[in-house]
Structure formats: C-alpha cells, structure tokens
C-alpha cells in the first residue's frame, strides 16, 4: 500500500476527520490550530493558535467539536464551550455514537513533559441536551476512541497501558464489561489515535512503531501499514467509499524538514 503526502510542515498533527464533501480536518497539538484541506489541495486555517486539540468531530448543526482545555463547538468563526472541567490538563480524542452523543477522554498528566507521575483520566459522555456523565476512570493517557459498526462496543486507546480499553455499550449509552485488548501489538511504543472500519476492525496509530496496525475486534493483529515517521499519531477513514485511510504524524523520516505530515493511502 502506497502513501500520498497531502500536507506537511506542522508540529504534532492530530484529529483527522473528513466530511461528506471529502474535506479533511486536522489539528496541530503543540503549534496550535485547526485546519481544513479541500479536495483540490487548498489548506485553510479555521482556528488559529488553539493548542492541545487532540480530537475533532463534525457537528450536526454545522461546524465541528474540538478538544483542548475545554470541549468547544466551532461554527462559522464562532466558538461556544460545551464542556469544561476543573483539574484536567486537556480533553483529548472524542467520538460521536450513532445517536449523536459524544464520548471524550480527559488527560490529567503533563502533556508536554509527560512526567513520571501520571494522574489517570476519565471518559465522559456528553448528551444531546449538553448534560454530561462520567462513564469510567483509570485511563492514564487517553487517546483514540471509536465504536463498532453496530455501536454496541466502545474502544478507547490508553497509551500507558499499551492497549485498548473495551466496553459493551447499552442503548442508553451506558458502558459495562470492561476489558483490555491489543497489548501484544504495542510491546515497543504506544497506541495513539484510532478508527474502526466497516468490518469492525481497529486501525491504531503506533507511536514508536512507525506504522498503523490493524487489529481484530478482540485484539489480534491482522495487518500493518508502514509509515515513515517515528510518531504516527492518528488515522481516519474518508473518501467516496470511506476506504481511504488518512494518517497523521509528528515527524517525517523521508524528509525531516517536512515535520508533521498528513498522508493518504493509495
């Protein structure tokens, strides 16, 4: 599988998402900003300077949700706060379920230094009316979030535990039956952002592994896509058939001057 380079020159790229017009949205965690790449290759800056945006999700009312120190709904240049919590460093990845509820993870550890003392974060659910529920804790470094195609299973990458936390999801959005999968795939390096394909398999960015790994729903490694970067940070499906995989990084080993890069499988 070949990789096409779509954008470069960023810091730590995160949050790839596509819309029905095949625009690609992504963020730069440390340099700051949220960007949109149109199908013709034009790149627009939508949000300037906002740092620690680890997750983006399209909003039914237009615009998108973005994380950072708070969860914000951005639309046509205006931003409103959806969720703010005391005592956290940042909200990181987030993902909607089929009913539009948002599942978002928190980070309480130092994002830039990742000091030895790590404070576990949580996963919250944001309801359609804006109310929130803490679903579970003990997520040391919260990363990618995704759902099985039928919405019955929630996947949540925890970088410190080197695997993916899994829960069953009820019709009311509640979670149960916590378990942990995929650790053998990340013996070197850590899992970061992720997405789930239409067959229910997980595609997980592997920081320190120079790849995206494909896992079965029970955590067995099925395949991998080599990526020319030490820090492969996230991935997302897009394209007319939702079969193009967009992969983002914090570096580029083929051309170090390009730094954080956006790739697409071809």
Feature-to-residue mapping (PLM):
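Beta-rich, blade/repeat-based domains predominating
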Residues: 7-21, 49-68, 86-102, 108-110, ...
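Beta-propeller domains
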Residues: 25-45, 71-72
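Short, solvent-exposed loop/turn segments at conserved positions within beta-propeller repeat blades
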Residues: 29-30, 109-121, 159-162, 207-208, ...
């Amino acid at each position: 599988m070949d990789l096409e380079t779509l954008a470069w020159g960023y810091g730590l790229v995160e949050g790839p998402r596509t819309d029905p017009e095949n625009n690609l949205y992504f963020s730069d965690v440390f340099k700051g900003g949220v960007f949109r790449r149109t199908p013709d290759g034009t790149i627009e800056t939508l949000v300037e300077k906002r740092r620690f945006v680890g997750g983006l999700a399209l909003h039914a009312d237009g615009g998108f949700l973005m994380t950072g120190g708070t969860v914000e709904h951005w639309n046509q240049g205006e931003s409103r706060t959806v969720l703010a919590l005391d005592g956290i460093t940042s909200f990181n990845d987030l993902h909607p379920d089929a009913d539009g509820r948002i599942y978002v993870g928190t980070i309480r550890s130092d994002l830039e230094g990742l000091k030895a003392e790590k404070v576990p974060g949580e996963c919250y659910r944001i309801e359609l009316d804006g109310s929130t529920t803490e679903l579970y804790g003990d997520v040391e470094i919260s990363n990618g979030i995704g759902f099985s195609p039928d919405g019955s299973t929630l996947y949540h990458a925890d970088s410190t535990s080197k695997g993916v936390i899994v829960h069953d999801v009820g019709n009311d959005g509640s979670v149960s039956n916590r378990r942990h999968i995929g650790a053998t795939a990340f013996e070197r390096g850590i899992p970061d952002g992720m997405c789930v394909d239409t067959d229910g398999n997980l595609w997980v960015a592997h920081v320190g592994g120079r790849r995206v790994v494909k896992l079965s729903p029970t955590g067995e490694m099925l395949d991998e896509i080599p990526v020319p970067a030490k820090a492969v940070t996230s991935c997302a499906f897009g394209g007319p058939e939702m079969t193009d995989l967009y992969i983002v990084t914090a570096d580029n080993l083929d051309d170090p001057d390009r730094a954080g890069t956006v790739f697409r499988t071809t």
